[in-house]
Amino acid sequence: MHVSCSKCGIEDILEFSKNPDEVFLEFLTRYDKGLVTEKGLSEGLTDEGIIRSEKEIKEMIGKNNPEKFIEKILFSKKDFISEYKILKNSEPKMGSKVNELGLEKEISDFLNELKIKQFYKFQEDAIQEIVFGENVVIEAPTASGKTEAFLIPVIQRIKKESNQGKVFAIFVYPTKALARDQYPKIKKFADKIKINVKVFDGDTKIEERREIIEKSPEILITNFDVLHYHLWHQTKFSSILSSTKILVVDEAHVYSGIFGTNVHYIIKRLKRICKNKLQFVAASATLDDAKTFCEQLFGEKMQLIKGSGKKGETDFVMLFPSLRTQRKLMVELTKKLTDKNHKTMVFSNSHLNAELLAMQAKKQKINIKVHRAGLMANYRMSVEKQFKEDKLQAISCTPTLELGIDVGNVDCVISSTIPVNRLTQRIGRAARKGQRGYAFLTLGNDPISQYYKNHPDDYFEDIEKTYIDPNNPFVEEFQILAMACDKPISKHELKEHQDVIEHHIIEENIIESNNRIIPNFEKINSVLNNYSIRGIGKSIDIFLNEKKVGDRTLPIALEELHKDAIYFLAGSRYKVKELNYPEKNFAKIERIPKDYPYYTKSLTEEWPTIETVFEKRNAGGIEVAFCKLHIEKKVYGYVNIELGQEVTQGEKVMLDTPLEYDFITKGIVFHAPKPLEIMEKSEDEEYTEASGYHATEHVVIEGSNMITGGVSQDLGGISLGTSGLIFIYDGAIGGSGASKALYDRFEKALERSMHIVKECPCKNEAGCPRCTFSYRCGNNNEFLHKY
C-alpha cells in the first residue's frame, strides 16, 4: 500500500490493511525510526517490481516515437507499465473492381457515386458467396466495411428474385439503439436502388406498423426480442415473416450465454414458419472460433470469411496501478487526455464502477457523463448526441457502447480488464478516420490483473470463449412452449425435444389434438409473457419523486436496492427509502447531500444443493463434478464504504427483514485438499481451514477469468466451512455455459490460481485485493487465509 504526505511529499510502501488508522500509525512509527525518507523510494520500488525501470521502458519503446504526454505517462513512476506497443493494422487485401462482379447496374452506379471503385478481398468473397446462396460468417474489424459486405449481395438478390411487398431479408441487431443507428446508412443505399427498408421494434409507431404489415419492406430491420414476441403471439406482423429468404445477424458475438441460447431457439422457430429454406449471414468484429460458434447458433454449416481493416496507428499501453486504485489511474488518464482535447471513451465493467469513475472525474473538472444500461433511453441518446457534437469531452460507459453506435469522432479508449477480443472491439471505436489513436488497458487491483501484470503475453492469448448452451433445461422448456404457440407441433417433429414435450403434456401446458400438439394458452400465457430471452429475469423499477428513472435486474437488484442502500444513477448518488419486493418490484430513492462520504456494499449468504450430477472427472488429482444446482441467496445486511478510500467504515448494518431469492443453475463442485501443514502451525485450526477454502474459492473464480471468456463476474462461489467443498456456479438462471467452460479448463484455472497467490508480494495472512479478495464477496472479504 502506497502512503504519502500531501504537504512534504515523503512516501512509503506498507503492508495492505483494511483499517486506514492502522496504516497511518505504522507510517508514523516507521518515520520516527528513520525508515521513511524523501529519497530513494523509486529505486526501491523498481527493485521490488512495483514500477518498471527507465531502462526497461526505453527498451519497450524501442524505435517508436510516442508523443510527449504518452512518454510522461510511461515514465510517471506511479504505475507498473506491463506493455507498450504501437498497434498497426495490416493493409486489407484488395479484391475485384466494382464493375467486375456482375452487379446490377444501379448498384454499380451508386457505388461509383460513393467513390467506391474496388472492393476489399473479404467483401468480394462475401458478396459472391451470399449471392450464390451460401451461409456465411464475416469476421472483420470495426469500421472495415462489414455492412457493405452483406448489404450489397442482399440488395443484388432482391433485385434478381424479389416480389415487391414481401419481406426478403431480415437484418437483426442486438439493440434498438444500434438498429436505429444503422438504419440511415442502409436506407440511403436501398432508396437509391428503389428497395424498401423499414425498422420494426418496440419504438415503431402504430401507423408505421400498419404500413409495414400492409406493404411489407424487402429489408426488415429488427431484433430477436421482437421476433420472439410476435412469433408466439401469432400477430399480423409474424405472418409477413414467412416469405423471408435471408437472415442477417450483425454483432454475432453478442449472442453468447443465455441470450444466445434463446436466440438459437428463435432461429429454429423462424425456420419452422418460413416457406423457404433460410440462408444465414453473420457478421462480427470479434469472435473466438467464429465458424464453430455460428454453426451452433444457427444450426447450419457456415463458411468463414475473414478480413482486415484500414485504420490509423494506435498507441497501446497496459498499466498496473501499483501505488493507487484502478479508478484513480483511469481518472488521471482521462484528465491527461481531455486536457489535450482528445475525445475519450472510458469503459468500466459494471454500473457501479462507471458511476464512481464519472463522479471522481467531475471533481477533476472533466466534462463527462455516464452511459449505461438501466438509464432511460432518452438520457442515453442525449449523452451520445452531446459527445458526437463535441459538447462532452468524455463518456464513462459500460459495454453498452462497445457495439457500433455512432458517437462521432473518438481519439482515445481507456478500458478496465476484459478479454483481448473485446478490448479490440473497444479500441476499434478510436481513430476510425485514420488519425493517431490512444488505447489504455488499466489492469485492476484484483487477482487476474496481478497475473497479467507479470504475464502480459498471456493476456493476448486469452481469447474470450463465446458459447451457448442449447441444453439449458429452462430455456428449452420455455422455447418449446413458444414453438407450439408459433405453429402447432406435428407428432413426428422435434424428436430431439421429446422429453420436454412429454413433460409439458403431463403438466397440461400443451395438448395433443388430431396428431398435433397445440398450446394451452390459458395456462401458459402469463408464463411466456413474463419470460425474458436475455436471461435477465424480472427487474426492479426505480422511482424518484414518483417518476421512473431507471431499473435494475434481479437478483443483483436486491444487493443494490435494499432499504438504506446508496444507489448510483447517472453520476449522482441516492438513498433507497423503500423497496417493495417481491409483491410489486419497485424501489423509491431520494437525493442525498453531494458531500455524503459513503456508499454501501451488501452482505449475503448462499446455500447450494446438488440436484443432478451431469459428469465428473479427475483434474490434477482433484475430482470435479459438473452439476445442476439449486442456489438459495439471502441479502441480510450491508457495510458503509468511504468514497475514495474504498475501505469499510463503522459496523455492519443488519436489515430488519432479509431479502431472499432462489434459482436453479449449473455449476461445478470440487473438494479442496486439506491444508494440514498450515493447520498444524495455526492456533485456530478450524478458522485457518475454513478461511483457506474461502480464499481458494475466490482465487479459482478470479483465475478462471478470461479462461472462461472474461465472465468471472457471471460466476458465483460458495465454500462450505471446513468441509472443503467448493461450489462455483453460473449466475444466470438455468446456467449460461461459463461454469462448463471452467469445468473443461479446470487444470488451467488451478495453475493460474497458483501463480496469482505465489506472485503477489503481499505478506498479509488474509491476502489482499490482488490475490485473495473479491469485490463480489458477500462476506466483505472476511475469513480469508492466503497460506
Where are these regions (language model features)?
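Conserved strand-helix element at the start of the C-terminal RecA-like helicase core
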Residues: 168-182, 334-361
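Conserved helix/coil segment N-terminal to the catalytic DExD/H
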Residues: 202-245
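Helicase-associated low-complexity/disordered flanking segments
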Residues: 2-4, 11-121, 135
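Conserved interdomain linker/interface between the two RecA-like ATPase lobes of SF2 helicase motors
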Residues: 291-350, 468
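Post-DEXD/H (motif II) to motif III coupling segment of the RecA-like Helicase ATP-binding lobe
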Residues: 246, 253-308
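Extended Lys/Arg-rich polyanion-binding regions
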Residues: 419, 436-439, 445-462, 477-493, ...
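Conserved RecA-like helicase motor core of SF1/SF2 enzymes
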Residues: 365-367, 373-381, 388-394, 398-447
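Conserved SF1/SF2 helicase motif Ia
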Residues: 156-181, 274-277
